[in-house]
Amino acid sequence: MAKLIVDGIDVEVPNGASVLQACEAAGKEIPRFCYHERLSVAGNCRMCLVEIEKAPKPVASCAYPVADGMVVKTDTAMVRQARRGVMEFLLINHPLDCPICDQGGQCDLQDQAYSYGMDHSRYAENKRAVKDKYLGPLVKTFMTRCIHCTRCIRFSSEVAGVPEMGAVARGENMEIGTYIEKALTTELSGNLIDICPVGALLDKPNSFVARPWELRKTVSVDVHDALGSNISVDGRGSEVLRILPRTNEDVNEEWLGDKSRFAHDGLKRRRLDKPWVRVNGKLQPATWPEAFGAIAARLRSLPGDRIGAIAGDLCDAESMVALKDLTAGLGSANLDCRQDGAALPAGRREFYTFNSTVPGIEEAGAILLIGTNPRRESPVLNARIRKRLNMGPCPVGTIGQPADLTYRADHLGNGPAALGNLGVFGDKLRAAKQPMIIVGQAALRGPGGAAVLAAAWALAVEVGALTPEWNGFNVLHTAAARVGALDLGFVPGPGGKDLQGMMGGGVDLLWLLAADEFDTARIGADTFVVYQGHHGDRGAARADVILPGAAYTEKGGTYVNTEGRVQRGFVATQPPGEAREDWAILRAFSASIGQSLPYDDIGAVRDRLAQVNPVFAHQQGLDRRGCTDLSGPPAGDTMGDGPFGVAVPDYYQTNPICRASATMAECTRTYTAPLQLAAE
């Protein structure tokens, strides 16, 4: 530890820390443009100049290491004059675009010019102008505003792992851009907008829409993948206008995937805003009593074993426990939440959660990916794996379809046969201090999925990934609702049917709770389908009765991420038209048939959640534990010999919100369609 004095305050920081970090530890605010806590140090903006005793001139605090006994001054006349000079140089070529710039009101350059700049300009020469660059459908460029901080270059190379941005030329001719003019091929490109300190990189789909001070901010949880990234939903009136990441070191740090950030325009398209009932083969608008009456009329003649329910990928825990209680009251054990057919058992949590936790990735000594492409399934988690590799040696092996993960990985095979023949990588896995195995949904689909899960667990035991201090067995989900549903036991009860068993006439009444990710053509022609959800998607097209529900931004909901971390979102906007929160719809229907569910408000529903599974009583907290019980999950059928499939064939089209989004459709045309054409 190094001891130094900052503006008369004694500070102790680790050896190797920068002077800027020491100043922050002393509570001093140091202006900066190029420095970012999660990127390498560039030291090229010079805005963070401070005075160090016995130094001949001001030094850049972000790039200067501390030394024992150092005396630092952050607010002397020399420092103020130096910062004023730097700001004057930065503004020489910067246009006066503040009144029309989308960054206005949240611009670092604006704020620091006010605090450290001059009240007039002495520059009377011509300003330079730079041609705007094309970076794809999500990031808009105004390169004349660029101050060459190089944050975007470092983010692309270090965090996203796609080194497509760089600087060309030198001096006043220097420009930032892509070496070849094409769209950025990263699922994290929206983060460039957040880290840009000026208005050079902006939100293209939402440009010139609103000022930041006009927006109402609501904390929430993302549902577009299973990581549960913490987000801020910014709305005005009844419309969501943007979604930004919230910092959570244990989940998403401060990053957010492009789908989570930009798909919100799908929240206002193809919405279900009133009940519908199919009459003579055609869906007709109806009232709530008429819709409930149509369902009740069908229920009267049915025994419990002819009723089934399927929960979708975006459901909150409150609606799932209400539907489970409703079906139980009707005498049915036909439940399923695994639309993709993944062989995941409910019960012991270690068999279906990411046990090492997301921060635990940084402690892994070696990583084996089985049937998963984390770049497509969870880009922010993939960035965490890349971060681990940037910290030091960590061999990575993959079993499944070959893919560019943005980091070096040994491809060991395409299917389950490779689990028994890891070769040299197996030796690396056994030699690693804390080996990690990540199993994806593509490996668990199909009749051999249970055997793959059991084999992966046995492999974890064999390589030493399961110890009292470390649990290196992890399941990476693709659905935000999946872990919560398994925690609630939303799977077939004794004698119950799974999704496959409910298809083809296996039940006479099927309740789809926002379930759109399976082939509805498999449903029996005579099966009466109730679809409860928020978008007119696949499930609604097959429905006999449609009950309009609320999207994730329109209700307070509890979600459990792939780690098993319980998180909660809050209401940002109101549902459109006659749509209502899903648990309330189920409660109202139960009352209409004389079997009222035992809760009247959201607090009572959450008490019921904690009663069903105590994990719902605790939010955010997640204790990482080792594994003391080495007995594995049931093996089921034998493993197949075919290759694993792909869990997410199109990153931008994974749920009804994305499929309704014009922005996501443009991304598919830009990124996915050319790849599919090339493959053909």
Predicted feature residues:
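Short, glycine-/polar-rich solvent-exposed loops and beta-turns at beta-strand/coil boundaries
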Residues: 35-44, 64-65, 170, 604
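A cross-taxa feature marking solvent-exposed loop/turn segments within ectodomains of secreted
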Residues: 55-57, 466
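N-terminal export/assembly segments and adjacent metallocofactor-ligating motifs
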Residues: 1-16, 24, 36, 51-55, ...
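Non-catalytic alpha/beta scaffold blocks inside enzyme catalytic domains
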Residues: 335, 339-620, 671, 675-680
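A basic, amphipathic helix-loop patch mediating RNA/tRNA/ribosome contacts
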Residues: 19-53
